[in-house]
Amino acid sequence: MARNANITRETKETKIEVFLDIDRKGEIKVSTPVPFFNHMLITLLTYMNSTATVSATDKLPYDDHHIIEDVAITLGLAIKEALGDKRGIKRFSHQIIPMDEALVLVSLDISNRGIAFVNLNLKRSEIGGLATENIPHFFQSFAYNSGVTLHISQLSGYNTHHIIEASFKALGLALYEATRIVDNEIRSTKGVI
């Protein structure tokens, strides 16, 4: 069974289109109006070993909030759809990733209980067109819509770029590991995720 999804989400504020194949490493295309966000999405999808296209149009281009939130929602929905009933997935993963002085831990459970706990000390208010207050919001919106319980904690570091990038790398690696098929069972004592 192919584990992929094609999701379009259009509101009065944005139009987001996401194609995601979590089993096939291939081309990654990302186009949003926020340059640093493009870099982070490419990083996330690369470390997931996926094939992906993300296209985001901002209909009300007065700040980056709607784009960040709506891409997170749509990408989360794409992962949830691609995983189907989650049969056979490893389900859990954690990664501790350095980027120079920064060290970030990501731990997740594909539990169908989407929530995020984000502890990042981002000292710069903006980087590459992205308000750093939207980084935790991205992770929260993504977790809620993907059904992932997500913990992200900064263990060390002071460079905002490094801290954010280590977070996206760690999330990508953790998602890759947690979505791998390890058997034919539903990994839950309830028999359903």
Swiss-Prot record:
It is found in: Cytoplasm. One of its GO terms (molecular function) is imidazoleglycerol-phosphate dehydratase activity. One of its GO terms (biological process) is L-histidine biosynthetic process. Keywords: Amino-acid biosynthesis, Cytoplasm, Histidine biosynthesis, Lyase. It catalyses: D-erythro-1-(imidazol-4-yl)glycerol 3-phosphate = 3-(imidazol-4-yl)-2-oxopropyl phosphate + H2O. Its main location: cytoplasm. Pathway: Amino-acid biosynthesis; L-histidine biosynthesis; L-histidine from 5-phospho-alpha-D-ribose 1-diphosphate: step 6/9. It comes from the Archaea. GO terms for cellular component: cytoplasm. PROSITE patterns: IGP_DEHYDRATASE_1, IGP_DEHYDRATASE_2. Its EC number is 4.2.1.19. The keyword Lyase applies. Pfam families: IGPD. Belongs to the imidazoleglycerol-phosphate dehydratase family. This is Imidazoleglycerol-phosphate dehydratase. It comes from Saccharolobus islandicus (strain M.14.25 / Kamchatka #1). The lineage of its organism: Archaea, Thermoproteota, Thermoprotei, Sulfolobales, Sulfolobaceae.
